[in-house]
Amino acid sequence: MAGRSILIIEDEPLIAMMLEDFVESLGHVPAGTADNIDDALDCVERGGFDLVILDVNLGARECWPIADRLAALSIPFILATGGHVSAPPAEHADAPTLPKPFTLDTVRDALENASVSERDIG
């Protein structure tokens, strides 16, 4: 899998920094971070990335407006999920997931699964 540009949408700064480190360690390029829905949607509209790691819970809100926009633009994303998360809406049920807590191996696996999903779609 060639190096990709990855946008990280995560509301916890330390987790976002850890994901940036993991992404770089795996040969990819962090394309930036966003920690809330409004900033994330602005980043999505600007573009400049190949893939998104998207935290399901962003503060008191869920990520579905962002996931909807990414899907409309055919931009692949991985849903980062923590403990008490409800099932995603049906239109995002097949999105690759990355369960918390993250490890380098689980991030690698999620990125590889996202690549496989893209090939299946394309």
Question: Could you describe each region identified by the protein language model?
Answer:
Residues P13-G32:
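Two-component/phosphorelay signaling modules centered on CheY-like receiver
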Residues P65, A72, G83-K100, D109, ...:
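Alpha4 helix (beta4-alpha4-beta5 surface) of REC/receiver domains from two-component response regulators
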Residues F102-G122:
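C-terminal output helix
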Residues T33-L51:
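Acidic, metal-coordinating helix/loop segments flanking the phosphotransfer/catalytic sites
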Residues G59:
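The feature encodes the CheY-like receiver
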Residues D55:
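Active-site residues of response regulator receiver
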Residues E10:
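Conserved acidic carboxylate
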